[in-house]
């Protein structure tokens, strides 16, 4: 794990389509793509993030990494929107990993002390880090997450061969200011931070990654890496989409009327 994808198996793995704005409308100003591999030990991720100014300041694990530009992974093994994982890392290879019992909308506890035992991560910089005197090209991340940890929320002891999980990827990017040679998040005239950009693999439709029902489907094929696989979303999943529409309507009704619709 070195932050690069120069091995033949990585070269054979296709990139995703370029990320899109989280609401699914605007095209991001910097390109982001991701690819994945798996074996019987780990789930592997590689992401390439184009950027002319690569900077990061946070060095303590489990701080709020998205206060820097970052790359994020969200994993819901059994697709029930409960007991899902969030992972974030910046260009300094500082990580934040946590377990969410339920989405924030349910006011459930967040297990910030949860760590991915055996996690391996690396960053590669195509340019310079924290140097505003030049123009950078990109930074890339490589990540290995052990199945032994990820399976804890899957309801199964097996690797999901020829099966799917709900997963999404996010990239948070900030406009920046410079104080001499030090980067920081840009503020408006009133001193408030400008809003971040949120670029994702599977659009959420809203500025909120914590609606797991909108995440994408990742299918774990047992075929050779270079062989294309046709994946069709099961009919049961389409029924589940309709049930989530009903759920959101009920939540909206309760918020306004302080009672459930009957």
Name what the model sees in each region:
Residues 1-247:
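Structural preference for beta-rich elements and adjacent junctions enriched in aromatics
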Residues 245-262:
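Short, glycine/small-hydrophobic-rich surface segments
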């Amino acid at each position: 794990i070195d932050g690069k994808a120069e091995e033949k198996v990585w070269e054979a793995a296709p990139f995703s389509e370029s990320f899109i704005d989280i609401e699914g409308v605007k095209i991001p100003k910097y390109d982001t793509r991701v690819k994945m591999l798996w074996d019987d030990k780990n789930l592997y991720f590689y992401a390439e993030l184009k950027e002319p100014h690569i900077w990061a300041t946070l060095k303590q694990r489990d701080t709020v990494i998205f206060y820097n530009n970052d790359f994020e992974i969200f994993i819901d093994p059994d697709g029930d929107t409960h007991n899902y994982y969030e992972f974030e890392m910046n260009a300094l290879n500082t990580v934040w990993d946590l377990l969410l019992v339920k989405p924030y909308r349910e006011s459930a506890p967040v297990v910030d002390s949860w760590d991915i035992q055996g996690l391996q991560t690396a960053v590669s910089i195509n340019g310079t880090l924290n140097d505003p005197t030049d123009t950078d090209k990109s930074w890339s991340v490589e990540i290995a997450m052990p199945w032994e940890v990820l399976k804890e929320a899957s309801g199964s002891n097996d690797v999901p061969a020829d099966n799917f999980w709900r997963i999404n990827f996010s990239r948070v990017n900030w406009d920046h200011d410079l104080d001499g040679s030090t980067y920081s998040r840009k503020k408006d005239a009133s001193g408030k931070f400008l809003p971040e950009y949120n670029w994702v693999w599977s659009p959420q439709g809203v500025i909120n990654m914590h609606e797991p029902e909108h995440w994408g489907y990742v299918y774990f094929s047992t075929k050779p890496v270079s062989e294309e696989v046709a994946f069709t979303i099961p009919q049961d999943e389409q029924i589940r989409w309709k049930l989530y529409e009903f759920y959101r309507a009920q939540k909206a009704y309760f918020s306004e009327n302080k009672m459930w619709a009957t």
